[in-house]
Amino acid sequence: MYTAIILAAGRGSRIGFRKQFATLCGKPLFMHSLEKVLDIFEEVILVLPEDFLDKVKVHPKVKKVAGGPERQDSVFNALLQATGDIVVIHDSARPLATKKMFLEVAQLGDYHGKVVASPARDTLKEVVEGKVIKTLNRSLIWHAQTPQAFRRDILLECHMRAKAEGFVGTDDASLLERYGYSVGVVEGSYWNVKITYPEDLEMVKKIMGCEED
């Protein structure tokens, strides 16, 4: 069985407000991702700020779980409630992820996990204190996105090990990498942008044709 986990518990520290509840084309931002997974996966978990659990009304199929102080804590809380053999984790701040991405990343094959990612287009520099150290090999660099999918037992083990040693990864795949598990890649789309700043939200509105929001 598959479990989809939609993360919508962020504080919005960089954008200045809880972006998951911002209106995008007539509905809350998080709802765009939630609606895509409802008819794909058997179990759906929506991770919310604890004080929003009773305020947010969703489909009866959706299990609401309180998030934690950080993203990693929120995923861990959801994993404890998930029952699927494979979990598909997605940041609600990426409303342009397609159903095709969710379906493809969930097919793990021989991997312990898979991520949606896009090959780097720009020349990338390693910079320390304002000084360019070297140019990275662009052909080896991919921009990781979500959704990401994992064997639940493996990801839960990695989360527990990370918690024990105080390690915080920037995404869930980084935990598997740290502990020697295999992670595959599904090529995503450059349109699958993450809304981090106000201008990102305005750009996505233009892409979706709902600038009037």
UniProtKB/Swiss-Prot annotation:
Catalyzes the formation of 4-diphosphocytidyl-2-C-methyl-D-erythritol from CTP and 2-C-methyl-D-erythritol 4-phosphate (MEP). Pathway: Isoprenoid biosynthesis; isopentenyl diphosphate biosynthesis via DXP pathway; isopentenyl diphosphate from 1-deoxy-D-xylulose 5-phosphate: step 2/6. SUPFAM superfamilies: Nucleotide-diphospho-sugar transferases (SSF53448). It catalyses: 2-C-methyl-D-erythritol 4-phosphate + CTP + H(+) = 4-CDP-2-C-methyl-D-erythritol + diphosphate. The record marks R138, K194 as: Positions MEP for the nucleophilic attack. It comes from the Bacteria. The keyword Nucleotidyltransferase applies. This is 2-C-methyl-D-erythritol 4-phosphate cytidylyltransferase. GO terms for molecular function: 2-C-methyl-D-erythritol 4-phosphate cytidylyltransferase activity. Keywords: Isoprene biosynthesis, Nucleotidyltransferase, Transferase. CDD domains: CDP-ME_synthetase. Belongs to the IspD/TarI cytidylyltransferase family. IspD subfamily. The record marks R14, K19 as: Transition state stabilizer. Its EC number is 2.7.7.60. It holds the Pfam family IspD. One of its GO terms (biological process) is isopentenyl diphosphate biosynthetic process, methylerythritol 4-phosphate pathway.
